[in-house]
């Protein structure tokens, strides 16, 4: 019994302040996504397969903040766990807003150093859908952690 209770107790203490609420895409979030150009008919994933998370994270000053992100339902529990682990070690996140807040512009979201996931778009330099279009890729602090092309090029000067 002690073997079971001790890990549960330690996990509970470690994540006592961490919160992450998961929900389906509500009509309000759907409206934001459509008006913000991050989802439209023809995207490879229907809205019913996406989940909205409100996640507590730490900023670069160590303050607790609430952010939001959308991911595929198949990875939502893993994403919640990973962000819990990041919270526990004090890993800072500049901001976490939906790409819709940047009119679906990956460029603008990155320039704002915004941590984001779902965005229905083509992969950089490709005609194929990006992993972000499936809600299965996350950019965390993209200025500090930039996308680097195969040739070693970084597109954002602040990176």
For each feature predicted by the language model, list its residue ranges.
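Active-site acidic/histidine clusters and adjacent loop/turn architecture
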Residues: 45-110
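Residues that flank catalytic or metal-binding motifs in active/ligand-binding sites
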Residues: 49-51, 114, 133-136
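Catalytic cores and adjacent binding grooves of peptidoglycan-active enzymes
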Residues: 123-125, 129, 134-159
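Sec-dependent N-terminal signal peptides
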Residues: 4-13
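N-terminal module-boundary/linker segments of secreted carbohydrate-active enzymes
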Residues: 17-63
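Conserved short secondary-structure elements within globular domains
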Residues: 101-128
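Structural recognition of the beta-strand scaffold that forms the well-ordered cores
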Residues: 54-56, 117-120, 137-141
